[in-house]
Amino acid sequence: MAFKLPALPYGMRELIPHISEETLSFHYGKHHAGYVNKLNSLIKGTPLESCTIEELILGQTGAVFNNAAQIWNHTFYWNSMGPNCGGEPTGPIRKKIEEKFGSFSAFKTDFSNLLAGHFGSGWGWLVLKDDGTADIVQTHDAGSPLKENLGRPLLCCDVWEHAYYIDYKNDRLSYINSWWNLVNWDFANKNLEAPFKWS
């Protein structure tokens, strides 16, 4: 069965002024959709058609892995943001952050600095480690915390250039600083309770 592009959890204009409608139309409508179409073409007529996205990420390499991981990563990224979100975390996620980093401010600085300094394309993640502590990790290109056993994803930020170049040009840090105004802490709290499933 062919995979379908998941619907965005908000409208194309609802992340303005932090992410423009033009960026979303290209990022979601071209890049994310392109990964879905490419994956479907790669697995059509093969036993992989019966696999879930997670199974493809964990069990495959090369182009199948890259496209499956990018589909999952982007879906998770869209859900990591929302209109009327941002601000400081509340609930259990705040406690996890403060236990690990001392304060939300310290966490925010560490996360921003890590992503601003990330070389090339990739992703920044807030994860829950196996020992129950929160941590910040980065993955390169289509890298996945699931594949690399880096912990359970709680939030992510996309630092591929197509995520920000229309709005911020080469100023990645300004994009990251603006992204904090969109962070969906309710989504992070849900991921503390149970792992996110794409399919």
Curated annotation (Swiss-Prot):
UniProt keyword Ubl conjugation, yes or no: no
Cofactor: Fe cation
Pfam families: Sod_Fe_C (PF02777), Sod_Fe_N (PF00081)
Source taxon at top rank: Eukaryota
Keywords attached to this entry: Iron, Metal-binding, Oxidoreductase
GO molecular function annotations of the record: metal ion binding; superoxide dismutase activity
Residues reported to bind Fe cation: 27, 74, 158, 162
Enzyme Commission number: 1.15.1.1
Cofactor binding note from Swiss-Prot or TrEMBL: Binds 1 Fe cation per subunit.
Record's catalysed reaction(s): 2 superoxide + 2 H(+) = H2O2 + O2
InterPro entries documented for this protein: Mn/Fe_SOD, Mn/Fe_SOD_BS, Mn/Fe_SOD_C, Mn/Fe_SOD_N, Mn/Fe_SOD_N_sf, SOD_C_sf
Function: Destroys superoxide anion radicals which are normally produced within the cells and which are toxic to biological systems.
Assembly notes: Homodimer.
Name of the protein: Superoxide dismutase [Fe]
Phylogenetic classification of the source organism: Eukaryota, Sar, Alveolata, Apicomplexa, Aconoidasida
